[in-house]
Amino acid sequence: MPTLRSATASASTAGTASPTAIATPRSAKRRLTSPRRAAGSPDASQFTSPHKSPNVGIVGTPKLLSASPRSSRKRLYGDFVAAEKPKWNPRGKSPESHFSRAQSSDWDLTKEFICSADPAQMQVVKEALHVATVPSCGLVCRDDEQSRVLEFCKGCVEQERSGSLYVCGCPGTGKTLSINKVKESVARWADETGMETPDALSINCTSLAKTHEIFSKILAKFQTRKKATCKLSPLQQLQTMFSHKESAPRRMLLVVVDEMDYLITRDRAVLHDLFMLTTYQFSRCILIGIANAIDLADRFLPKLESLNCKPLVVTFRAYSKDQISDIIKHRLKVLEYDVFEPLALEFCARKVAAASGDMRKALGVCRSAVEVFEARLQESSDQEFGLVTFDHMDIALSKAFKSPVVDSILCLPQHQQMVLCALANTFHHCKKKATTLGELNKSYIEICRSTQVPAVGMLEFSNMCMVLSDQGFMKLGQSKEDKLRRVMLQIDSSDITFAFKGNRFFQKCLEQQKF
């Protein structure tokens, strides 16, 4: 085999020097290892199979690209695919990787890999639905309430006057989050207009060891320098400060008192004195109280109304189903992929809106539905990447709105549960409000016969009914004979039906006709 040197010498003797012949060893090696790059060169025949014609045409390399179906698809549809919203992949891997792993001999390892959910993606979804997570898009569905509070604060700052406002509403209606947003808006507005930015103080009354400590926190924010008044209580120091122009602070103070219900004492003195701080002539306090009680200002502050200083009341109404759905969708926008089926979200919104309108409850239900979906994903080997469905949401809602009575029923022994089933059947079929212990025993025996469970004797049956009566499930009357004692159901029969939902054994007991 001739060497490169001899090949070069012979080529120069012949007088026909080709580009390949005069190439250096390094360039020749690069061309040999990159036949795709060399396909467009004049000597492409040296790098192609002798049985196939080289892909050389008028346009050279672009023709080689057009011969690849994959490249053609990427050119034609690449822009369209990129514009689509990416799918949620809860397993963290693509279906192709699952398929390739499934072809391996280690099937146990592959099955464990396929059945495991991606904890990183699950955690991102749960954090987006967490109550403590402040949505980047801002608070939606509370524009009117925020506008009223903001205008109130602006008026106080512009006129350098004190004022009080009371924010009320059911739990989970966005009160605290809205007021925090207003605080930021007030500071931003003051900077833009050249006004002096007011100081801000947020107090959660649940953190106070004693109710009167709230005055110490307010006094510390003003940073008074007078030492002669140290013998006075913090409330007295504030009252003295706001009564004289010389001692009054120059800067306004925005005080936000959350969970104001905890300040309600027997004499209501703390709550009354707190609102009265805004009535002094040289007061610089803008007080905003937040509580769940809608009529707190009417019930606990009658003196304020007589002094013509009743606070402005802003009520946050419970969220509607459309508002709950919109808020959840806004939180999920940061994920850039769909997690819930639309029907599942609508079901959650309708259920929570009908019950309480509590947004925190709705977010908790959605997180629970994701956990149910995650548990199902661990158990299933299906390679399809589904969404959180209506069934997952139904399970989560059942857990969230389950009555404490249901938990008590599920903790009872089997025969006592069967007695409750017999009692529910008796009242359901006969439409009665009461029966006798003897009739209830017949229904119980019929259930035992149909389920092939040995029934207990009459004495033990009577003792079981007495235990159920002591626990509040039923009420037993008095009689000389046990069989004639009146029995009344003390709980809702729907709780019994709901407790045994999905249990085949007790479903059969509840379907039993009256004996």
UniProtKB/Swiss-Prot annotation:
Q: Name one GO cellular component term.
A: nucleus
Among the GO biological process terms of this entry, one is: cell division
Q: Which CDD domains match?
A: AAA, Cdc6_C
GO MF terms held by the record:
ATP hydrolysis activity; DNA replication origin binding
* Residue stretches of biased makeup (Low complexity): 1-24
What are the record keywords, sorted?
Cell cycle, Cell division, DNA replication, Nucleus
Under what name is this protein listed? Cell division control protein 6 homolog
Q: State the gene name recorded for this protein.
A: CDC6
